[in-house]
UniProtKB/Swiss-Prot annotation:
It comes from Bordetella pertussis (strain Tohama I / ATCC BAA-589 / NCTC 13251). GO terms for cellular component: cytosol. Gene3D superfamilies: Adenosylhomocysteinase-like (3.40.50.1480), NAD(P)-binding Rossmann-like Domain (3.40.50.720). This is Adenosylhomocysteinase. Its main location: cytoplasm. The gene is ahcY.
Length: 472
């Protein structure tokens, strides 16, 4: 891997700075499709609410993320950035942001060792300063500081890695502690809070909070309605098949496609596949989600039942070993297997290590079993839409990232209102604000309640219009 570091600046690592011009042109296009972020820039640029914020960002380094980064900077923040996935970086986006002077450490196809090196670098600020905010996706940046601080007190927490990724992470922490025995606790003490982007990271935060281990306040961005019901659903509805088709050129129509998990992400995936006239089967553990899938006309089965019959498999659960080695051994020759959940362990990729691997092209592999049968594994079990394509469209990411920006402002400027160790969601009026910022772009014209109508249903004329417990 030929990473590029500018010797005069030496505070970024990207694949090729010559790609910066291309990245800048795509950023300009993305800005026209991200009205929420651009409106927030206009609203807050003068007041600079993030002045003094030093944000350590760990989120897919895409063009859309570039617009987020430049919005945070426009509002006064200083930012250091790494990707939260080894395959999700768009190298031209990383170069374009690095060219502006914002430190970026991200390369598409980086190794696990490089991944954790780069995640450490977002906490290595010059002149003895430290990050005071985290913007996270999947929770790795948050995990790094907490686990490292625990290891300072008890190195045995690093004794038994449960996966290759943990082995690399634990080694990186040990190496860092060898240089500075207080590296993690020093930085952890400076953090005011974290805003977390995705389901998996939010799950981690709630676990840490319940155990009394979370060292700062957190805002759960994922469960804002304008994130989970848009990014997770509509974003995946477009980006899943983009990734599958770029990787394989497969004809989806007529195929049997299995979607594991029928949450918001799984719903979007199922809608996309059925729109291309696949026969969609769903696997579920939750009776409510299973009933929803059945009522939409999908066949709900077990993975054991589906394995031998389907042509395309998509995991969307956020769980562990949803597709096992045994399942894959039962699959058809040339079955396509991919994941759209955050981590790579939804598919038991580690269980395939003793199979023969044949790279077809980057992020597309034949896995050949002893009997000669092959499956096509996409993105090595990591996010297919970002590993094999470019992720969600700009418009839907504007909604997600508007939530992230507002959450950063909330947590930084009103930190005393958020209790250390607790996880919060943004209030309803801010969720509705994010939605409003995107209506004009789609030509939407809202109706307005009269005072009498508002009184009749017991809401303010200007909203919020739904109670917090309302399920959209």
């Amino acid at each position: 891997m030929n990473a590029v570091t500018d010797k005069s600046v030496a505070d970024y690592i990207v694949a090729d700075m010559a790609l910066a011009g291309w990245g800048r042109r795509e950023l300009a296009i993305a800005e026209t499709e991200m009205p929420g972020l651009m409106a927030i820039r206009d609203e807050y640029a003068a007041s600079q609410p993030l002045k003094g914020a030093r944000i350590a960002g760990s989120l897919h380094m895409t063009i859309q993320t570039g617009v987020l980064i430049e919005t945070l900077v426009a509002l006064g923040a200083e930012v250091r950035w790494a990707s939260c996935n080894i395959f999700s970086t768009q190298d031209h986006a990383a170069a374009a942001i690095a060219a502006t002077g914002t430190p970026v450490f991200a390369i598409k196809g980086e190794t696990l060792e490089e991944y954790w090196q780069y995640t450490h670098k977002i906490f290595e600020w010059p002149e003895g300063r430290h990050a005071n905010m985290i913007l996270d996706d999947g929770g790795d940046a948050t995990l790094l500081l907490h686990l490292g601080a625990r290891a300072e007190q008890d190195i045995s927490v690093l004794a038994k890695p449960g996966s290759e990724e943990e082995r690399v992470l634990f080694a990186a922490i040990k190496e860092t502690l060898g240089r500075d025995p207080k590296w993690y606790s020093t930085r952890l003490a400076q953090i005011k809070g974290v805003t977390e982007e995705t389901t998996t990271g939010v799950h981690r935060l709630y676990q840490m909070s319940q155990k009394g281990e979370l060292a700062f306040a957190a805002i759960n961005v994922n469960d804002s309605v304008t994130k989970s019901k848009f990014d997770n659903l509509y974003g995946c509805r477009e980006s899943l098949v983009d990734g599958i088709k770029r990787a394989t050129d497969v004809m989806v129509a007529g195929k049997i496609a299995v979607v594991a998990g029928y949450g918001d992400v799984g719903k979007g995936c199922a809608q996309a596949l059925v729109a291309l006239r696949a026969q969609v089967w769903v696997t579920e553990i939750d009776p409510i989600c299973a009933l929803q899938a059945a009522m939409e006309g999908f066949k709900v089965v077990t993975m054991e039942e589906a394995a031998a019959h389907a042509d395309i498999f998509v995991t969307a659960t956020g769980n562990y070993h949803v597709i096992t080695r045994q399942h894959m051994e039962a699959m058809k020759d040339q079955a396509i297997v991919c994941n759209i959940g955050h981590f790579d362990n939804e598919i038991d990729v580690a269980g395939l290590e003793n199979c023969q691997w044949e790279e077809i092209k980057p992020q597309v592999d034949h896995v050949i079993f002893p009997d000669g049968k092959r499956i096509i594994l996409l993105a090595k079990g990591r996010l297919v839409n970002l590993g094999c394509a470019t992720g969600h469209p700009s418009f839907v990411m504007s909604s997600s990232f508007a939530n992230q920006t507002i959450a950063q402002i909330e947590l930084f400027t009103r930190n005393e209102a958020y209790t250390t160790g607790q996880v919060y969601v943004l209030p309803k009026h801010l969720d509705e604000k994010v939605a409003r910022l995107h209506l004009k772009k789609l030509g939407v014209k809202l109706s307005t309640l009269s005072k009498q109508q508002a009184d009749y249903i017991g809401v303010p004329v200007e909203g919020p219009f739904k109670p917090d417990h309302y399920r959209y």
